[in-house]
Amino acid sequence: MDKYTFTTAQKIYLPFKRLIGILGSIIGIIVCLTFLWWWVFIINCFVTKGHPVFRQERYGKNEKVFKMVKFRSMKLDADPNLAPSEMNEDTQKSMETGFGKFLRITSIDETLQLFNILVGDMAFIGPRPGSAHNEEHLRECRKKYTPNAYMVRPGISGYAQIKMQRSHDPEFKAKWDSEYVKRLGFFFDIGVFGYTILKVFGAAKGR
């Protein structure tokens, strides 16, 4: 596999993207603490019997393992090593709480990842990280591509996710994660971010 080198424009953009992540996550945390998280935390405490927050090991930039944080959307007896997107549809439905389904449809469960962005584990936009305990196939697929997803910070949303269909397929994800790194840039990130917002509102409206 050939070594990939970022373009000059990408090298300039990457520190700027990190600055956006720091400032954006600080603003987001303040807003969420004020208007959102307190009531989600209280409701989820009752629903999950006192376990409202969930942490799971994921692979980040340069394959470094970090703990991604989110509001718990699954029952306590769900497999802690599997992300909901890695479960088959029947298992996901049986393990999902009623309130958890709402959190996932609206993507509110992902908002705690603002803390991951702040500390530098993640970015707003980037390849979506899979669970560290079940990502071997995805890692193999990603490493077949140049560039690959592990060259950049993983994101809350990514290019593979907005492609919608078959986004759970490792080959599909690896291909579009590689394409994201190739096209990495400010306006491309804005486009992915905007499409993500439309997709979230569309999913919530559709339910």
Give short role names for the model-derived ranges.
Residues 99-100:
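Alpha-helical coiled-coil
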